[in-house]
Amino acid sequence: MNEKNIKHSQNFITSKHNIDKIMTNIRLNEHDNIFEIGSGKGHFTLELVKRCNFVTAIEIDHKLCKTTENKLVDHDNFQVLNKDILQFKFPKNQSYKIYGNIPYNISTDIIRKIVFDSIANEIYLIVEYGFAKRLLNTKRSLALLLMAEVDISILSMVPREYFHPKPKVNSSLIRLSRKKSRISHKDKQKYNYFVMKWVNKEYKKIFTKNQFNNSLKHAGIDDLNNISFEQFLSLFNSYKLFNK
């Protein structure tokens, strides 16, 4: 993702009143280390450094890096890295959380990056409301892949009036809470394959007719358009048994 395209997709929240309202839904304490995705003009960064042990802001726009550094000149518990989040290597040997008001047009890429390439125990993101709903939709491949690794919650609405420039749609604050992976390391490739075939309704490529009917019955599924993640895991476990 080049710098020009990312800058054109950025919408900033600058009102301290609105930022404080959002922050009430984010669990932070003075011991937390935070990686912030996109410092923007430093308005959220400033509130994060007041609440946390240390903040590392990752910002691709060189000018915004300087703006953030100038805004936080009275604080020393932060650093701003002029880097592309999609190329950033998160540490593997420390505890941290992630926060970001992320660009709509690369939300999928960013969320894949931070769930699968970081060990953050909690992730807070401001995303487009429709995107947030899709993350809870078990008919979507991204939702099924994420739900195996994190619990996903929509914490609050973020009205489009909070942003400058004002986008066409409302946003949501979401939380992704890390959990023990529901898929063993040796089964991850098999799970990815199963997810893609299921979402594309290529049932014949993963089950025979009898296997399919028995798997649905075992999972307690009456409606293919309305299944829970636990029911989906039951289907995957049946698939594994049939393909030992």
Curated annotation (Swiss-Prot):
Molecular function per GO: 23S rRNA (adenine(2085)-N(6))-dimethyltransferase activity; RNA binding; rRNA (adenine-N6,N6-)-dimethyltransferase activity
Top-rank taxon, per record: Bacteria
Induction: By erythromycin.
GO cellular component, one term: cytosol
InterPro entries cross-referenced by the UniProt entry: KsgA/Erm, rRNA_Ade_diMease-like_C, rRNA_Ade_Mease_Trfase_CS, rRNA_Ade_methylase_Trfase_N, SAM-dependent_MTases_sf
GO biological process terms, semicolon-separated: response to antibiotic
Enzyme class (EC, first level): transferase
EC number: 2.1.1.184
Annotated S-adenosyl-L-methionine binding sites: 11, 13, 38, 59, 84, 101
UniProtKB keywords: Antibiotic resistance, Methyltransferase, Plasmid, RNA-binding, S-adenosyl-L-methionine, Transferase
NCBIfam families attached to this UniProt entry: Erm23S_rRNA_broad, erm_C_23S_MT
Function: This protein produces a dimethylation of the adenine residue at position 2085 in 23S rRNA, resulting in reduced affinity between ribosomes and macrolide-lincosamide-streptogramin B antibiotics.
UniProt-recorded name of the protein: rRNA adenine N-6-methyltransferase
Species: Staphylococcus aureus
Name of the gene encoding the protein in the UniProt record: ermC
